[in-house]
Amino acid sequence: MTNDKEKRLKELNRMQYEVTQNNGTEPPFQNEFWDHKEEGIYVDIISGKPLFSSLDKFDAHCGWPSFTKPLEDEEVAEKVDKSHGMVRTEVRSKTADSHLGHVFPDGPGPNGLRYCINSAALKFIPKDDLEKEGYGDLKHLFD
């Protein structure tokens, strides 16, 4: 992963690097996926690991893509974040150790969680491209 990660880091734009590597936050309502409605999955921009599904995406009116849950809990790590004078729960990708965003206890659904994720940390794979992009095992989500 180290060589792959180094290669992928060099391919990131400034915002993607700032968010994923320096725990940055992109501007609300001015990012690629905040209002994105196409069916598919969102993967870690660095590792390519599947993180979230459009089926779990909802409009939280916060300006960032929001999800009720990750695709697989094993790929998302939570960490206490005491920056900016508050205590929050940071969300990171386990494989690439990239900053993704934060999770808050104010979401809809049975778990009541809102995963507020930076678009800059994600790559979207449309459901019709899952097989072609190597995520064919997740096609069943959209049947």
UniProtKB/Swiss-Prot annotation:
EC number: 1.8.4.12
Family matches, as Pfam families: SelR
Taxonomic source organism: Bacillus pumilus (strain SAFR-032)
Lineage: Bacteria, Bacillati, Bacillota, Bacilli, Bacillales
Active-site residue list: 116 (nucleophile)
Keyword list, A-Z: Oxidoreductase
A GO cellular-component term linked to this record: cytoplasm
GO biological processes: protein repair; response to oxidative stress
Domain MsrB: 5-127
PANTHER family: METHIONINE SULFOXIDE REDUCTASE, PEPTIDE METHIONINE SULFOXIDE REDUCTASE MSRA_MSRB
Protein name: Peptide methionine sulfoxide reductase MsrB
Catalytic activity: L-methionyl-[protein] + [thioredoxin]-disulfide + H2O = L-methionyl-(R)-S-oxide-[protein] + [thioredoxin]-dithiol
SUPFAM superfamilies: Mss4-like
PROSITE patterns, A to Z: MSRB
InterPro entries noted in UniProt: Met_Sox_Rdtase_MsrB, Met_Sox_Rdtase_MsrB_dom, Mss4-like_sf
EC class of the enzyme, as a word: oxidoreductase
GO MF annotations in UniProt: peptide-methionine (R)-S-oxide reductase activity
Domain of life: Bacteria
Family listed: Belongs to the MsrB Met sulfoxide reductase family.
Disulfide bond sites: none
